[in-house]
Amino acid sequence: RKGGVQDILILERDSELGGILNQCIHNGFGLHTFKEELTGPEYAARFIEQVEALGIAYKLNTMVLDLAADKTVTAMNKTDGLFQLHPKAVILAMGCRERPRGALNIPGYRPAGIFTAGTAQRLVNMEGYLPGRRVVILGSGDIGLIMARRMTLEGAKVLCVAELMPYSGGLKRNIVQCLDDFGIPLRLSHTVVDIQGKERVTGITLARVENGKPVPGTEEHYDCDTLLLSCGLLPENELSRAAGVALSPVTGGPAVNESLETNLPGVFAAGNVLHVHDLVDYVSEEAAAAGAHAADFIRSGEQPGGPVLPVRCENGVRYTVPTAIRPGCAGDTLSLIHI
């Protein structure tokens, strides 16, 4: 809207704006953007207030079913039924999903009591349910660390947090505030090799890991009724694939140029759908840039073709965003490059 575009529509599948922030009731958000510490809902509310003040339209409880290469959006909700939109530009902001048990190849039965950390977070913080009493958490990503603290505060006993790698995947501040302050053990280079229980989890077996494989004879048993999985996030790009958006084999998100534009003219991407961010402040910065570039595209139309230079990663650099730049088009936008 600040770029001069009047007709803007936000499609949200949940019952309220804010996305994952609504279930993140812990503080630590907004230190970069607002120079103060906010909870997730407070941070989201700052932007929702801006959306309302600018008169930007949005549809809640609306599921986008398809995105075509010509930018036709097919969606549905209870009020409008099935409908199509034909925008001049689309910004992909679907976020990411947690890696489920099926992607982890953990042996054992499939009893109740196995949750991703984000699902458990929603159950506790928004639905008012406690998933279990004796908990083991696999994976030391930020969500897993935060849920170790949250479950403890709600009265559960967190037996340990196990991490496959020899280092934690979460922020140092979360290790200190969520584990150390509550006396929760962090078992590095360990993974779950078996889940016991038929109707409900009754226990799990941990083993030490070397070179990515469990070491025989190092198994340890934990009596628990709940296993939380915090084993990484995957950009949610079903719609991107349907439209023919080229995806990065490293991040799993769209491959974009310096304007955060995909290989489809007028289709942009920002946030965790592009690549997983550590801080929501960086998501906001990236989203603002994508919005500005989308507004430029609408005003000026498709940019003339020209050379596109891929960004090549050397030793020590896993990936960059953008994955390609157009000489002469970058301007100051490369200040947003992520490595």
Locations of the language-model features?
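Conserved small/polar residues in nucleotide/adenosyl-binding loops
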Residues: 337-339
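Beta1-alpha1 glycine-rich phosphate/pyrophosphate-binding loop at the start
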Residues: 1-46, 50, 122-125, 131-177, ...
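A conserved FAD-binding loop/helix module that cradles the flavin
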Residues: 270-301
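Glycine-rich dinucleotide-binding loop and its adjacent helix/turn
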Residues: 96-136, 140-145, 250-258
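Active-site-proximal substrate-binding core of FAD-dependent oxidoreductases
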Residues: 275, 295-329
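Core beta-strand elements of the Rossmann-like FAD/NAD(P) dinucleotide-binding domain
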Residues: 81-89, 216-225
